[in-house]
Amino acid sequence: MAKTLYEKLFDAHVVYEAENETPLLYIDRHLVHEVTSPQAFDGLRAHGRPVRQPGKTFATMDHNVSTQTKDINACGEMARIQMQELIKNCKEFGVELYDLNHPYQGIVHVMGPEQGVTLPGMTIVCGDSHTATHGAFGALAFGIGTSEVEHVLATQTLKQGRAKTMKIEVQGKAAPGITAKDIVLAIIGKTGSAGGTGHVVEFCGEAIRDLSMEGRMTLCNMAIEMGAKAGLVAPDETTFNYVKGRLHAPKGKDFDDAVAYWKTLQTDEGATFDTVVTLQAEEISPQVTWGTNPGQVISVNDNIPDPASFADPVERASAEKALAYMGLKPGIPLIEVAIDKVFIGSCTNSRIEDLRAAAEIAKGRKVAPGVQALVVPGSGPVKAQAEAEGLDKIFIEAGFEWRLPGCSMCLAMNNDRLNPGERCASTSNRNFEGRQGRGGRTHLVSPAMAAAAAVTGHFADIRNIK
């Protein structure tokens, strides 16, 4: 029977499936960070259990860390306790930890792929909703809760029901300057923020195949923002070339054997999906969210929508509430909306290609008066690479702040946050009320669009910036 990529990955990992019971899946990689793991390790300790597969478990610090100093005390008591607990737990249970002083430390979903921990065909879990990022490699990757973190630590397995399948095909080629972030925001604009609920999404089509691995990671990272369980892109030569030579990737003949298997990880001809969505790449322009969920998104050259234009009463009420929170009036051009802060970073857009795209806009320009702009590389290796290329100097000369790796202003769990009423052009993944700080107003954009907002002081079409 013809199978989708998701069905192949799921079926290959079923350890046991009794009739009328939820299947038990084997987990190939478990990524751990300081926020969702302390109680899980306490649970192991209370029952005298070891970590079943410490060699398949990798930990880092990201959510709570300061991006201005490597001092563990910098972000307050709760952050310090969580980081100290992670150090203690990893030492006691034999788990590899990339702590604040480790050169590989960084956002968990940046660290995994760049170290070759993430490989095609794997099941990957983490106590973090944006674990879907790793699906860019043709891996089944999804976020789990803290009780499930404990279960995986103890057994290297997890009970998981089968999801529905969705194909999202982006046909044709994207226009110059249109990024994976624009593509995925356009997709969510079409599906809505709950359009993928109960599904695992496979992204395909020419515009997706044209993306680099970093672009595919941005795409899959935000699958969760349309309500999907996970996002997938079938592995191809782009994938294999990215993986080859990385620290934890197979070497020599093992790599060749792995590639031979990875090439089978494609949706079969004739396989059926529960839901199919199609977009035309050439119709996608630079995207900016205007509301308080990622589906409330428009082209940069559009006007803020009028809630009265929504036929659905729920959407209309949601739009009214969003505009009130965001302090926006219907009908005004988006490019007239001024911003206070810019955040370039997060597990969505903090990799080297993202920083290059932002630096290209920042070069030779200055951050607009009254705007604070942060650039936060996703990991130690990304920061080192950017500095080797001189990107840090471009940003600093333009008036951006060049920070240490971490989750930073994506979420208000550290010192980087918005004050009430502040408006931010952000390359992160969520624009919910209070996500970047109580009363903060978040607009999601690509790295180049964020840099353009920083230097102009308002939203601007990067295609018009010469």
UniProtKB/Swiss-Prot annotation:
Q: Name one Pfam family in it.
A: Aconitase
The name of this protein is: 3-isopropylmalate dehydratase large subunit
User: What are the entry keywords?
Assistant: 4Fe-4S, Amino-acid biosynthesis, Branched-chain amino acid biosynthesis, Iron, Iron-sulfur, Leucine biosynthesis, Lyase, Metal-binding
Q: What is the source species?
A: Shigella flexneri serotype 5b (strain 8401)
GO MF terms held by the record: 3-isopropylmalate dehydratase activity; 4 iron, 4 sulfur cluster binding; metal ion binding
Q: Which reaction does it catalyse?
A: (2R,3S)-3-isopropylmalate = (2S)-2-isopropylmalate
Cofactor binding mode and count:
Binds 1 [4Fe-4S] cluster per subunit.
Cofactor(s) demanded: [4Fe-4S] cluster
